[in-house]
Amino acid sequence: HHTKFIAKQEGRNLKYIKKCFHVPLKGPDFETLKILKLIAKNNIVLNTGHLSAIETLILVKYAKKLGVKKILVPANNFDIATISKLKQFKVVFEFSYFFISRAINIPLTHVDGEKHKITGTNENKLKELIKEAEPKNVILSSDSGVSVLPLPHLSFYKFIKIIINFGFSKKEINYMIKINSKNLFNL
């Protein structure tokens, strides 16, 4: 948090929105390029954060050109076409319980005292997104560090039960909750 994309969703004022991070259509600005070069040089993970689909595609394209090898993309609100395009760059997709939980219906604070609702997704769409991304490219998380949800480990347990009900195998779930994270972060 905080990007122009999210600030616009939250209905923030224009003065606030202008100060937020974004990736221009022409490509990342000089400061962002410097950060991408540092990430590449140190072989650390780039988390693209809460950007729009087009911003994420642009950022990932530039990151790969600069040698960034490990990219984590929060993808709960993307469509199948965006997931398909991002797969070409060999990113890891993150899907979290938060975006299908009741927390999306409750105004919450994130970066300041203002309360806003977050755009979520539904379980059917989530299942299709994970299928498109493919379990070997997915990390599941609870993202449950808000007071209206159960403790993160309990939320994660609930999320895993939902994923099991989607029909993913134990092997696929093992990739999504353990193996992919270990590989991405060299653990």
Which residues are covered by each model-predicted region?
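Divalent metal-binding pocket/active-site signature
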Residues: 1-80
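Divalent metal-coordination and catalytic microenvironments
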Residues: 46, 93, 143, 173, ...
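Histidine/acidic-residue-rich catalytic or RNA/ligand-binding cores of hydrolases
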Residues: 57-61, 82-86, 103-126, 146-160
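Short helix-capping segments at alpha-helix termini
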Residues: 65-69, 133-134, 165-170
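Acidic (Asp/Glu)-rich catalytic clusters
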Residues: 36-40, 64, 83-90, 127-135
